[in-house]
Amino acid sequence: MNRTNFKKYISYVKETKKTNIEDQYVEKDYLISVFLSTWQNLKDAGKIPHLDKLIFKGGTLLARNYLDYPRISEYLDFTYEGSNKLRELESKNKREKAILKRITPIIDEIKLICDMAKFGFDTNRTNRKYIMVRNSRAVYTLNVYHQSMITGEEIPIKIEINFLEHIFHDCSEITINNIVTQDLFLKSIGYNLSQIKFRTYPLDEMIIEKYRAILTRDELKERDVFDLYLINKNCKNVLEFDNKLIFKKIESGYMISPDRSNNLEKNCTLLHDGDFGDSDDDISHLSLVEINEKDYAEFTNQLYDKLKDICTMSV
């Protein structure tokens, strides 16, 4: 798609979604779709078999397939399919070696996607611009870059892969939605993106992961509360979820990041003292929907009460 047609695409998306969101966020969403479309094309050609071992999850999945695109999500989050078994290895050293063996071909296949879709990426694991490793190889963060058609600057897209997640629910394959559905107009301006098929987290797994994120991040991200609010409003009552299961999900995160235990203690203290809730995560610039502030505040109060109940389980 050339620059002139891309401007038409942005206008079409804004008109379709009835939003005045800034062009740069529409472009980032488009580039994520380009990356995923290229992934599917290479997958169909049988050239990236190791990427089939990744299970899609997170805010991008929620936005695209469960919540009818209420906001732009900027990242791609995955869990390795064998993460439950990797957790069973008895030593950190054995886990690290097993993860290293698995990540190498995954990185090479991400590079194939980048080369075909004209994203910048370097497979050198010492180059932190492109690859970051956290928590004894439990989590790999890959950053790929594409030149903006609007500004000419590099646009980063973060891909996070977790190798030590405890998955509690079965995962099935679904087709991932794009922000717009292919039609004659889009075809006329050169839009020809495929929709990728991934194995994905079910909604229940994402809900308990959102609870864990809220209670164990170093700092609250408003998007986690916002996502639970929208799930509760449109899909399922998140306030009725089993606290014991949520706490098991929280405990499972300590192997991924030991700091989460201290963060839980800190956040539970803030909740108890009425000081929890500060966030510098401004999601208004990413939102495509209007939110009833009264309803949102009421849900947040109910959510915080539930979080306090979960905190009592950590004593």
Describe the function of each predicted region.
Residues F56-T60:
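Glycine-rich beta-strand-to-loop/alpha-helix junction loops that act as flexible
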Residues M1-L54, R64-E74, Y80-V315:
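Structured mid-to-C-terminal alpha-helical surface segments
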